[in-house]
């Protein structure tokens, strides 16, 4: 028991340094192995206790049997007029009856302890089966909880508004690049005067496009909310 407590304290101290339920499958498998080891030891103890109980029972039965023989011998000796021989047989009978009583008491005690051990073993085996039945479900629940926690942490790190604003900024930049490219192409066919002539109109159209783009952005954000 002392060694087991030391081991449990050591295991507990190690687990405190680990992430909580970092690997539930490993922990549950270890728990199952520990229970199986305890059950194996309990079975060995039961075998030994059964042997002890059997030995006491055998000694009790042998002593009682010999005591019975000595009683018969004493009666025969007494009937034959051999009183001293009868006394000797009776003395041995009394001694054997005392030993038989001792062995019987030891047998009953050992047998009672054996029954308790068998009851404890049955309880352990029931618990082990219960753990095995629930193990996979517990592992699945732990994995699901861990995955959900990981996803929540990931989502917390992402600023969705910031990401969306970055998307709009890139979109506007691409639009400006397209406009500059188209403007440059048309400039090759026109003159500087023509560019100045339509500059205000072009700027007005650009402003309309920007306004429309912002309206679309606001509508999209409102729909997402």
Curated annotation (Swiss-Prot):
Pfam families, per the entry: PspA_IM30
InterPro entries: PspA_VIPP1
Keywords: Coiled coil
Induction context: Induced, via the two-component regulatory system LiaS/LiaR, by antibiotics (vancomycin, bacitracin, nisin and ramoplanin), cationic antimicrobial peptides (human LL-37 and porcine PG-1), Triton X-100 and severe secretion stress.
Recorded coiled-coil stretches: 58-151, 161-182
Top-level division of the source organism's lineage: Bacteria
Family as reported in the entry's similarity comment: Belongs to the PspA/Vipp/IM30 family.
Name the record gives this protein: Protein LiaH
Organism encoding this protein: Bacillus subtilis (strain 168)
């Amino acid at each position: 028991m002392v060694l087991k407590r030391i081991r449990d304290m050591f295991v507990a101290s190690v687990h405190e340094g680990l992430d909580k339920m970092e690997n539930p499958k490993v922990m549950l498998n270890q728990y199952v192995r520990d229970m199986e080891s305890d059950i194996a030891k309990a079975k060995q103890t039961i075998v030994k206790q059964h042997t002890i109980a059997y030995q006491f029972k055998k000694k009790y039965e042998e002593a009682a049997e010999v005591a019975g023989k000595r009683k018969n011998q004493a009666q025969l000796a007494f009937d034959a007029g051999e009183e001293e021989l009868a006394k000797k047989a009776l003395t041995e009978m009394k001694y054997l009856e005392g030993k038989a009583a001792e062995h019987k008491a030891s047998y009953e005690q050992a047998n009672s302890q054996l029954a308790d051990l068998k009851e404890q073993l049955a309880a352990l085996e029931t618990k082990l089966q219960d753990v095995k039945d629930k193990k996979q479900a517990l592992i699945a629940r732990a994995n699901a909880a861990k995955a959900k926690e990981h996803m929540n942490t990931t989502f917390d790190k992402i600023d969705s508004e910031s990401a969306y604003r970055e998307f709009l900024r890139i979109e506007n930049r691409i639009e400006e690049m397209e406009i500059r490219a188209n403007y440059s192409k048309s400039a090759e066919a026109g003159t500087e005067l023509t560019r100045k002539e339509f500059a205000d109109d072009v700027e007005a159209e650009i402003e309309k496009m920007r306004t429309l783009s912002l309206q679309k952005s606001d509508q999209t954000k409102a729909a997402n909310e």
